[in-house]
Curated annotation (Swiss-Prot):
Record-linked Pfam families: FGF
Keywords from the named record: Angiogenesis, Developmental protein, Differentiation, Growth factor, Heparin-binding, Mitogen, Nucleus, Secreted
Name of the protein this chain belongs to: Fibroblast growth factor 2
SMART domains associated with the record: FGF
Entry's localization field: Secreted; Nucleus
PANTHER family, per the entry: FIBROBLAST GROWTH FACTOR
Record carries keyword Secreted: yes
Taxonomic superkingdom: Eukaryota
Membership in a protein family: Belongs to the heparin-binding growth factors family.
Primary gene name: FGF2
Lineage: Eukaryota, Metazoa, Chordata, Craniata, Vertebrata
Function, in words: Acts as a ligand for FGFR1, FGFR2, FGFR3 and FGFR4. Also acts as an integrin ligand which is required for FGF2 signaling. Plays an important role in the regulation of cell survival, cell division, cell differentiation and cell migration. Functions as a potent mitogen in vitro. Can induce angiogenesis.
Site keyed Important for interaction with integrin: positions: K131, R132, K137
């Protein structure tokens, strides 16, 4: 295709398979989000005491999350009111830390079903996931294709 020819279509390079779809430059904050889990209809919640779980109540102040691009396709997830970062520990537990560590970075990937997945950068076979009960699902029990790992980012402005 001739570049700039009348009626031509500009083709953009394909996105890498690292989940880098539409990533912002490092340090850029997107608007706060709520992460809605397809499994059980829970919103991911980061509590001030460091616990992580899911809740169905849209007005819960602890479901407002700040996703920050750390590098292409990699985000940290911070609870706005808890002021803590989502982390995955070496045993697969999800909890929230006051300071971001290597355990707080996740590969954000838009899946073909338009849900996002958040895979630990440090423990790369493990995903952020919620069970049908609203409890988090430990990393070693997660994997591709599970409903528990699918999250729909929704605006938290309202």
């Amino acid at each position: 295709m001739a570049a700039g020819a009348a009626g031509s279509i500009t083709t953009l390079p394909a996105l890498p398979d690292d989940g880098g779809g539409g990533a912002f430059p490092p340090g850029h904050f997107k608007d706060p989000k709520r992460l809605y889990c397809k499994n059980g209809g829970f919103f991911l919640r980061i509590n001030p005491d460091g616990r992580v779980d899911g809740v169905r109540e849209k007005s819960d102040p602890h479901i407002k999350l700040q996703l920050q691009a750390e590098e292409r396709g990699v985000v940290s997830i911070k609870g706005v009111s808890a002021n803590r970062f989502l982390a995955m520990k070496e045993d697969g537990r999800l909890l929230a830390l006051k300071c971001a560590t290597e355990e707080c970075f996740f590969f954000e990937r838009l899946e073909s079903n338009n849900y996002n997945t958040y895979r630990s950068r440090k423990y790369s076979d493990w995903y952020v996931a919620l069970k049908r009960t609203g409890q988090y699902k430990p990393g070693p029990k997660t994997g591709p294709g599970q409903k528990a790992i699918l999250f729909l980012p929704m605006s938290a402005k309202s």
